[in-house]
Regions:
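Conserved P-loop
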Residues: 1-86
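Short secondary-structure boundary segments
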Residues: 33, 55, 97, 129-130
């Protein structure tokens, strides 16, 4: 279990790099994006041809207008992830931005941690997102924290196709 967390840019990018590496070795890869609701990203356009890819978010924000809807959306995404985590044919599962759903209580942490603990022994999982909960960090084999040293967005540079999405 690898956790890529922190306030810096590149958490999802690091996970998708691992997905590309696994695919290059002929491994079956599954990706569940829990927050993002875009389906026009470069990573999905390319990796989605080779991996099972699910964009399950509805773009909700932390200042939600409908918590019940956000929880239902999270649970739909988790159902897909749980299926992958129970299937030994998946050698790598990327759970992109899962940390937010745990931190905000959109998913039951005990259920998620149990699924991660009892997944097939040869299955690798990458979890991304800011503020990884302590229990997830404790369970992980590897935790990387990406720092926000400087970001072009603060200088007014918008996300660019091929670089940021």
């Amino acid at each position: 279990l690898l956790v890529v967390t922190g306030n810096g840019k590149g958490k999802s990018t690091a996970a998708f790099g691992m997905a590309a590496r696994a695919l290059g070795h002929g491994m079956k890869v599954g990706v569940v994006q829990f927050i993002k609701n875009r389906t026009d990203t470069g990573e999905e356009a390319f990796l989605g041809q080779h991996a099972e890819w699910h964009v399950t978010g509805d773009g909700f924000t932390w200042d939600t207008q409908n918590r019940a809807q956000d929880i239902a959306t999270a649970e739909r995404g988790w159902a897909i992830a749980a299926r992958m985590l129970a299937d030994p044919s998946y050698r790598l599962v990327v759970l992109d931005e899962l940390t937010y759903l745990l931190s905000y209580g959109y998913l039951d942490s005990d259920v998620v941690l149990d699924a991660l603990t009892h997944r097939p022994s040869m299955q690798h999982v990458v979890v991304t997102g800011r503020a990884a909960p302590a229990a997830l960090v404790e369970l992980a084999d590897t935790v990387s924290e990406i720092a926000d040293v400087k970001h072009a967005f603060r200088a007014g540079v918008k996300a660019q196709a091929g670089i940021d999405l």
